[in-house]
Amino acid sequence: PAIYLAEKYNLLTIVISPLIGLMNDQVKNLELKRYPYAKTINSDISPILKQDIIEKVSDGKYHILYISPETLLSRSDVEQLIGDRTIGMIVVDEAHIVTTWGKQFRPDYWYLGDHIRKLRKKQLEKKKRSFITATFTATAIYHGIEDMYNETVNSLHMINPITYLGYVKRKDIDIVIDKKQKNKAVRRE
């Protein structure tokens, strides 16, 4: 969807990601797939390169921007990051962190929904265009006592979200257990 929104409407997708390694890996994988229009702004990036990325995002040369919630929320005005670009989508990657880390460890995750709501309102007033919020995770608990799904939906102020629940067991992953007995060779089961 991010590439479609960029190519068809020149809209920007902001991906909120918890770890620098994930951001760098996703940008690198897009580059390997010959999509050079995704960048990240994080503490691994030099100030000069950050400024260059910000200018190119603003100029419409980059269409997907990976940042942390702290980077987004530390800017009182998102235009410091994206200039006059119109947001087409905000993606919250590893969305279970909104509730698991957001309450104590990384509170900017917990306040992300309020900030996204303000961004949406401002963009609607200024450009008469809203944006999609999409969340992705493989580890959220759905319903029950520790219901991360509904807590995340509520924290991010998502109204009537479209939900896809996939199968958690993957056929392409095998688990091998090697038992080692004292002073004996390893045998496989």
Predicted regions and their residues:
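Conserved catalytic network of the ASCE P-loop NTPase/AAA+ motor domain
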Residues: L5-Y9, E31-K33, E55-G60, Q80-R85, ...
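Conserved helix-turn-beta segment of the N-terminal RecA-like "Helicase ATP-binding" lobe
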Residues: L22-I48, D52, K56-D59, N150-L156
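Conserved helicase motor
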Residues: I20, T40-K50, P69-R75, L165-V168
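Short glycine-rich substrate-engagement loop in P-loop NTPases that contacts/grips substrate
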Residues: I45-I48, I64-L73, K179-R187
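SF2 helicase catalytic motif II
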Residues: Y62-H63, E70-L73, D77-K128
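Conserved RecA-like ASCE P-loop NTPase motor core of nucleic-acid helicases/translocases
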Residues: L12-P18, Y66, T133-F136
